[in-house]
Amino acid sequence: MAALGGDGFRLLSVSRPERQPESAALGGPGPGLCCWVSVFSCLSLACSYVGSLYVWKSELPRDHPAVIKRRFTSVLVVSSLSPLCVLLWRELTGIQPGTSLLTLMGFRLEGIFPAALLPLLLTMILFLGPLMQLSMDCPCDLADGLKVVLAPRSWARCLTDMRWLRNQVIAPLTEELVFRACMLPMLAPCTGLGPAVFTCPLFFGVAHFHHIFEQLRFRQSSVGSIFLSAGHLIGPVLCHSFCNYMGFPAVCAALEHPQRRPLLAGYALGVGLFLLLLQPLTDPKLYGSLPLCVLLERAGDSEAPLCS
């Protein structure tokens, strides 16, 4: 999200420094070949993720519990092996990240609490209108609703619901691991931070094109810039899960709602507060040092706005 506000606007126009990249200085492949390796690696990950969903031949619909369980197995295997693609990319390009692989992919403790809470809070602010709409249409009051949400029985029921596990846990975790944590470190040295944010959704789109043949459904936009700003995987996963739960805002229903005036005011207020809080809540200083900045410095790009 930092790509949309403050210094993040400059991400889109990051100029490539003239300093020679470390990979070239060490006799590794040139920038052009490095980019081809990065793109091919990302495309391979996307195809592997999608291909794993169709290893199991079945005539059952995608929401059938048996199909969901099989796909759980497939995507968990691919996601577990995806860091090996980053290791192979590192060997082929000669770029040394300067941090451990897990740290580069967003598995780190420094700044983990703000990285988990602030991006989710910002996303919930953006969805202020839909949250108000959900509250207005709920037959129970706030106190009863909180009791249901906090009840252990409700969570136990969710954990046995295969569709809930897919939409709220497995899909956000595996997709963000593959399409954010693995792809962004490979793309950033080639394209720069800003273009990498908008390149990842292309591979994400390849991975979800198959849904056209199964079911037309809304997919939330990329949260890759959260990963860039915070350097943590947990923020994108939580935001992804929240967006899956909320779905696409029912704007048409809001226009016809009996309380449409306060509801539309909530929509407008949510967007306004989101734009107002975007830059301060995605300031990288809140989340500690960014592993991607170390990677870019090693690759010859230490002048990226987020790293300056």
Curated annotation (Swiss-Prot):
Q: Where are the transmembrane segments?
A: 25-45, 75-95, 112-132, 186-206, 233-253, 262-282
Mind telling me which InterPro entries this protein's record contains?
Answer: Rce1, Rce1/LyrA-like_dom
Q: Which reaction does it catalyse?
A: Hydrolyzes the peptide bond -P2-(S-farnesyl or geranylgeranyl)C-P1'-P2'-P3'-COOH where P1' and P2' are amino acids with aliphatic sidechains and P3' is any C-terminal residue
Instruction: Provide the topology term for how it sits in the membrane.
Output: Multi-pass membrane protein
Positions of post-translational N-acetylalanine modification = 2
Q: Which locations, inside or outside the cell, does it occupy? A: Endoplasmic reticulum membrane
For this UniProt entry, what is the primary localization, expressed as one broad class? endoplasmic reticulum
Classification via Pfam families: Rce1-like
Tell me which residues this entry annotates as catalytic: 175, 208
> What biological-process terms (Gene Ontology) are attached?
CAAX-box protein processing
Keywords for the protein's UniProt record, in alphabetical order: Acetylation, Endoplasmic reticulum, Hydrolase, Membrane, Protease, Transmembrane, Transmembrane helix, Ubl conjugation
Listed GO MF terms: endopeptidase activity; metalloendopeptidase activity
> What post-translational changes are documented for it?
Ubiquitinated. Undergoes 'Lys-48'- and 'Lys-63'-linked ubiquitination. 'Lys-48' ubiquitination induces its degradation. Deubiquitinated by USP17L2/USP17 that cleaves 'Lys-63'-linked ubiquitin chains.
Q: How is its activity regulated?
A: Deubiquitination by USP17L2/USP17 negatively regulates the proteolytic activity toward Ras GTPases.
Q: Could you name the Gene Ontology cellular component terms for this entry?
A: endoplasmic reticulum membrane
Query: Any keyword Transport?
Result: no
Name the domain of life this protein comes from: Eukaryota
- Keyword Endoplasmic reticulum listed? The answer is yes
Family of the protein in this entry: Belongs to the peptidase U48 family.
Q: What does this protein do?
A: Protease involved in the processing of a variety of prenylated proteins containing the C-terminal CAAX motif, where C is a cysteine modified with an isoprenoid lipid, A is an aliphatic amino acid and X is any C-terminal amino acid. Proteolytically removes the C-terminal three residues of farnesylated and geranylated proteins, leaving the prenylated cysteine as the new C-terminus. Is able to process K-Ras, N-Ras, H-Ras, RAP1B and G-gamma-1.
Q: What is this protein called?
A: CAAX prenyl protease 2
Q: Which organism is it from?
A: Bos taurus
Organism lineage reads as:
Eukaryota, Metazoa, Chordata, Craniata, Vertebrata
